[in-house]
């Protein structure tokens, strides 16, 4: 069997495990929060003692190991987009176990994601032949990729120390942008270390090369950072928001990193390149439909898109990396529009509790 199809099977298995792990982890965090009364947040001692949370972590570890192996056998341009399958699995399981809504648009989104995945599978090129891990180090030390790594490092440090403490609990993209940008470097390092293992098992020992250990250190640092901020996002925001956004941002950053590292997608066929781009757009569209279909209402979606406000748990992030849950929604401040005036006249209410602040003396509070 060709390496490409081995990687494909591993990637699909990985998506199944990771999609399931999102739900198990969320259930564990919810259970830990319930045990603490749901008001003071989830401390590390709470969720680390929760067997459900550990079940989610173990399932995710299995999925990540399969994903690790998939990058060894197949190119990132094939493996990464197939993460859409984990979004589909997460959506279906969230509807069943977390009682999150999956309507007609959600089902259409799932079907569209599958269609885009098939297109990518059919047109993904094979990986470049690599004889030693030092060859990948040579790619990684080229100016283009070094510049990319520098930008990611500076951006992540700025977000972690300046933005997260103040605004981390207001928008999931703050956490997920860190996860995704750092994750793109981890994928390249995982691929390098995986190839080193593959070559070593084939009789060409790569553990005599310093670069093998260098890639391993980068993998460890990046994964710790990813998991920390992914846990924060998952704890404070709905899975229907976190999963799709994480997929889109992680895929985009990873494909950009792969393109820069290997100076292209290892294909000269215009048909393949165009088909791959179309496949990505189709998957992104499906993920978007899946996201909006599981929101509370069209009005909430509109306000979220306009003002960048998402439903979050009413608790700032804690130092241990996992914030708390609350039964009270965060009130959203939005500018008054004539549409709300019309809705007021017929007695409609779109939110359980929110404030409308026009910024002048005509400030009103709406309560359900």
Curated annotation (Swiss-Prot):
<dbReference type="GO" id="GO:0005886">
    <property type="term" value="C:plasma membrane"/>
</dbReference>
<dbReference type="GO" id="GO:0015095">
    <property type="term" value="F:magnesium ion transmembrane transporter activity"/>
</dbReference>
<feature type="transmembrane region" description="Helical">
    <location>
        <begin position="241"/>
        <end position="261"/>
    </location>
</feature>
<keyword id="KW-0472">Membrane</keyword>
<keyword id="KW-0460">Magnesium</keyword>
<feature type="topological domain" description="Cytoplasmic">
    <location>
        <begin position="98"/>
        <end position="101"/>
    </location>
</feature>
<keyword id="KW-1003">Cell membrane</keyword>
<dbReference type="GO" id="GO:0015693">
    <property type="term" value="P:magnesium ion transport"/>
</dbReference>
<keyword id="KW-0812">Transmembrane</keyword>
<feature type="topological domain" description="Extracellular">
    <location>
        <begin position="1"/>
        <end position="4"/>
    </location>
</feature>
<feature type="transmembrane region" description="Helical">
    <location>
        <begin position="207"/>
        <end position="227"/>
    </location>
</feature>
<dbReference type="GO" id="GO:0016020">
    <property type="term" value="C:membrane"/>
</dbReference>
<feature type="transmembrane region" description="Helical">
    <location>
        <begin position="51"/>
        <end position="71"/>
    </location>
</feature>
<feature type="topological domain" description="Extracellular">
    <location>
        <begin position="262"/>
        <end position="269"/>
    </location>
</feature>
<comment type="function">
    <text>Probably acts as a selective Mg(2+) transporter. Plays a role in cell wall integrity and in engulfment by host macrophages.</text>
</comment>
<feature type="topological domain" description="Cytoplasmic">
    <location>
        <begin position="291"/>
        <end position="368"/>
    </location>
</feature>
<feature type="topological domain" description="Extracellular">
    <location>
        <begin position="123"/>
        <end position="143"/>
    </location>
</feature>
<feature type="glycosylation site" description="N-linked (GlcNAc...) asparagine">
    <location>
        <position position="266"/>
    </location>
</feature>
<feature type="transmembrane region" description="Helical">
    <location>
        <begin position="77"/>
        <end position="97"/>
    </location>
</feature>
<dbReference type="GO" id="GO:0005769">
    <property type="term" value="C:early endosome"/>
</dbReference>
<feature type="transmembrane region" description="Helical">
    <location>
        <begin position="176"/>
        <end position="196"/>
    </location>
</feature>
<keyword id="KW-0967">Endosome</keyword>
<keyword id="KW-1133">Transmembrane helix</keyword>
<feature type="topological domain" description="Cytoplasmic">
    <location>
        <begin position="228"/>
        <end position="240"/>
    </location>
</feature>
<feature type="transmembrane region" description="Helical">
    <location>
        <begin position="102"/>
        <end position="122"/>
    </location>
</feature>
<comment type="similarity">
    <text>Belongs to the NIPA family.</text>
</comment>
<keyword id="KW-0843">Virulence</keyword>
<feature type="topological domain" description="Cytoplasmic">
    <location>
        <begin position="26"/>
        <end position="50"/>
    </location>
</feature>
<dbReference type="InterPro" id="IPR008521">
    <property type="entry name" value="Mg_trans_NIPA"/>
</dbReference>
<feature type="transmembrane region" description="Helical">
    <location>
        <begin position="144"/>
        <end position="164"/>
    </location>
</feature>
<keyword id="KW-0813">Transport</keyword>
<feature type="topological domain" description="Extracellular">
    <location>
        <begin position="197"/>
        <end position="206"/>
    </location>
</feature>
<protein>
    <recommendedName>
        <fullName>Probable magnesium transporter</fullName>
    </recommendedName>
</protein>
<feature type="topological domain" description="Extracellular">
    <location>
        <begin position="72"/>
        <end position="76"/>
    </location>
</feature>
<feature type="topological domain" description="Cytoplasmic">
    <location>
        <begin position="165"/>
        <end position="175"/>
    </location>
</feature>
<feature type="transmembrane region" description="Helical">
    <location>
        <begin position="5"/>
        <end position="25"/>
    </location>
</feature>
<keyword id="KW-0406">Ion transport</keyword>
<keyword id="KW-0325">Glycoprotein</keyword>
<dbReference type="Pfam" id="PF05653">
    <property type="entry name" value="Mg_trans_NIPA"/>
</dbReference>
<feature type="transmembrane region" description="Helical">
    <location>
        <begin position="270"/>
        <end position="290"/>
    </location>
</feature>
């Amino acid at each position: 069997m060709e390496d490409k199809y081995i990687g494909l099977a591993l990637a699909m298995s990985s998506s199944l495990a990771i999609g399931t792990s999102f739900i198990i982890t969320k259930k564990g965090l919810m259970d830990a929060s319930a045990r603490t009364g749901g008001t003071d947040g989830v401390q590390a001692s709470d969720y680390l003692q929760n067997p459900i949370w550990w079940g989610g972590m173990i399932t995710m570890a299995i999925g990540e190991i399969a994903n690790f192996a998939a990058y060894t056998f197949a190119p990132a341009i094939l493996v990464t987009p197939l993460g859409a399958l984990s979004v589909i699995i997460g959506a279906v399981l969230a509807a069943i176990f977390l009682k999150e809504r999956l309507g007609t648009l959600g089902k259409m989104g799932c079907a569209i994601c599958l269609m885009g995945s098939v297109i990518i599978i059919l047109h993904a090129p094979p990986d470049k032949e690599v004889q030693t891990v030092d060859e990948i180090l040579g790619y990684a030390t080229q100016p283009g990729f070094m510049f990319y790594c520098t930008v990611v490092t500076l951006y992540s440090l700025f977000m972690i120390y300046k933005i997260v403490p103040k605004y981390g609990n207001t928008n999931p993209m703050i956490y997920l942008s860190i996860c995704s940008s750092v994750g793109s470097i981890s994928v390249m390092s995982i691929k390098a270390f995986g190839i080193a293992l593959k070559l070593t098992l084939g009789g060409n020992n790569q553990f005599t090369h310093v670069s093998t250990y260098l890639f391993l250190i980068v993998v460890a640092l990046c994964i710790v950072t990813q998991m920390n901020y992914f846990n924060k996002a998952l704890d404070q925001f709905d899975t229907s928001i976190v999963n799709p956004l994480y997929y889109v941002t992680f895929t985009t950053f990873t494909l950009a990193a792969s393109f820069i590292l290997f100076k292209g997608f290892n294909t000269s066929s215009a048909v393949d390149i165009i088909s791959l781009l179309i496949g990505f757009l189709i998957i992104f569209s499906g993920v978007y439909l899946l996201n909006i279909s599981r929101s509370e209402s069209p009005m909430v979606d509109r306000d979220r898109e306009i003002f960048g406000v998402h439903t979050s748990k009413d608790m700032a992030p804690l130092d241990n990396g996992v914030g708390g849950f609350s039964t009270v929604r965060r009130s959203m401040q939005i500018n008054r529009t004539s549409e709300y005036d019309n809705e007021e006249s017929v007695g409609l209410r779109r939110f359980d509790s929110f404030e409308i602040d026009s910024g002048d003396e005509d400030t009103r509070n709406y309560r359900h």
